[in-house]
């Protein structure tokens, strides 16, 4: 399993950007081009090497994520508990116990724990118990400092579902979503390393990855859409206005 590491003990803007680029480059098929653009496209679903491991090396320990390479869905994470035992927590319908052993060999089968809620944002948000504002991940914010704080909430601690869910919401957005959307990657580097308030555009991007990918795949020529599109933050006519980092795999270009 390919492992990509982000050092958060002494991070820099450049390190974070190249980390996101490495995720993107690991899953892309350089031969695939959609809509006459140069936007990276995920390769066809792999038969081997289905997962990617991401190590988030915080100043006080490492927590790791497991991602599906065919869509960058976060399917599991690995953290030490309060007895210094490696535990792997996973979404059962996204990865099997045997596959989990290949991603996180540090955790024995006895130390694999099923996450009892769904892997979709709404389920994770409910378990994060966000009380302010929209009660969604938007209220948590984003940023390197926040990622470090959220890692500390799950590293070398007894499991607390609220802290786990908050860590997942922040980590998913700063890894997989940043790889899909340069807009998010750029916000993190612009505010580096500080925590910043998320905005509606971030959320609209995150729920529109499929829609945007399909529009570029099926209704775009030389980077220009055949009509105006509105993905929730104003009309766009050119694909480059979307600052996309990675498109969903939709087959060979038509």
Curated annotation (Swiss-Prot):
Catalyzed chemical reaction(s): Endohydrolysis of the N-glycosidic bond at one specific adenosine on the 28S rRNA
Keywords assigned: Hydrolase, Plant defense, Protein synthesis inhibitor, Toxin
Enzyme class: hydrolase
EC annotation from Swiss-Prot or TrEMBL: 3.2.2.22
A single GO molecular function term of this UniProt record: toxin activity
The UniProt record lists the keyword Membrane: no
Keyword Ribonucleoprotein applies: no
Tissue and organ distribution: Expressed in seeds; most abundant in the perisperm.
One Pfam assignment: RIP
Family affiliation: Belongs to the ribosome-inactivating protein family. Type 1 RIP subfamily.
Additional notes on this entry: Thermostable at 68.9 degrees Celsius.
This protein's name: rRNA N-glycosylase sapovaccarin-S1
């Amino acid at each position: 399993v390919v492992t990509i590491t982000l050092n958060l003990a002494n991070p820099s803007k450049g390190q974070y950007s190249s980390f996101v680029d490495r995720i993107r480059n690991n899953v892309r098929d350089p031969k695939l081009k959609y809509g006459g653009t140069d936007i990276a496209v995920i390769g066809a679903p792999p038969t081997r090497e289905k997962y990617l491991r991401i190590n988030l090396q915080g100043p006080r320990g490492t927590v790791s994520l497991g991602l599906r390479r065919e869509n960058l869905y976060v399917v599991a994470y690995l953290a030490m508990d309060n007895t210094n035992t490696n535990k792997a927590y996973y979404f059962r319908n996204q990865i099997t116990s045997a596959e989990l052993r290949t991603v996180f060999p540090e955790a024995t089968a006895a130390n694999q724990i099923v996450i009892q809620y769904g892997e979709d944002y709404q389920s994770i948000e409910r378990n994060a118990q966000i009380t302010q504002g929209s009660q969604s991940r938007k209220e948590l914010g984003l940023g390197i400092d926040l990622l470090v704080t959220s890692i500390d909430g799950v590293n070398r601690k007894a499991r607390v579902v609220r802290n786990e869910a908050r860590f997942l919401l922040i980590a998913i957005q700063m890894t997989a979503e940043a790889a899909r959307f340069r807009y998010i990657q750029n916000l993190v580097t612009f505010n580096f390393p500080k925590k910043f308030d998320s905005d509606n555009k971030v959320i609209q991007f995150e729920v529109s990855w499929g829609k945007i990918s399909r529009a570029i795949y099926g209704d775009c020529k030389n980077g220009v859409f055949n009509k105006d599109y509105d993905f929730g933050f104003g009309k766009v006519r050119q694909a480059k206005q979307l600052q996309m980092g990675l498109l969903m795999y939709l087959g060979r270009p038509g």
